């Protein structure tokens, strides 16, 4: 059940980020380093290529979620860490905005689960 909750949460975060309108940019948000602020108060600070999140960056939501890591074409791709509001984290590989590849989920109580993830689901 927890696997499905994570998938739902990640899907909502990705959908919200993709649909929120940008309201302002500081720096070079076209081809360089900049900070975008969205109408829902989500922020992105990092590298941009052709006005897309691309390279290293940090995306933060007002509800406490924070992703730090690599982006490709505005999606989480490569190595990254997602921190949940309760302090839980996922650290590992990402592709197309989902946990894909080797990674470790650490709950706020310190319990860990390491394994191979595919489209946000732990493969057991």
Briefly describe each language-model feature range.
Residues 4-13:
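Sec-dependent N-terminal signal peptides
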Residues 15-17:
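N-terminal signal peptide c-region/cleavage motif recognized by signal peptidases
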Residues 22-31, 43-54, 66-77, 89-100, ...:
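Conserved anchor residues at repeat-unit boundaries in beta-strand-based tandem repeats, strongest
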Residues 58-59, 63-70, 82:
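Alpha-helical adaptor scaffolds
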């Amino acid at each position: 059940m927890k696997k499905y909750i994570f998938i739902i949460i990640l899907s909502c975060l990705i959908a919200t980020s993709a649909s929120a309108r940008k309201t302002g940019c500081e720096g070079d948000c076209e081809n360089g380093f900049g900070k975008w602020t969205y109408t829902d108060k989500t922020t992105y600070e990092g590298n941009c290529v052709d006005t897309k999140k691309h390279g290293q960056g940090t995306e933060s939501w007002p509800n406490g979620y924070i992703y730090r890591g690599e982006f490709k074409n505005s999606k989480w791709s490569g190595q990254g860490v997602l921190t949940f509001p309760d302090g839980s984290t996922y650290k590992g590989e990402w592709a197309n905005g989902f946990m894909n590849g080797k990674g470790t989920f650490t709950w706020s109580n310190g319990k860990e689960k390491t394994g191979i993830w595919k489209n946000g689901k732990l493969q057991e």
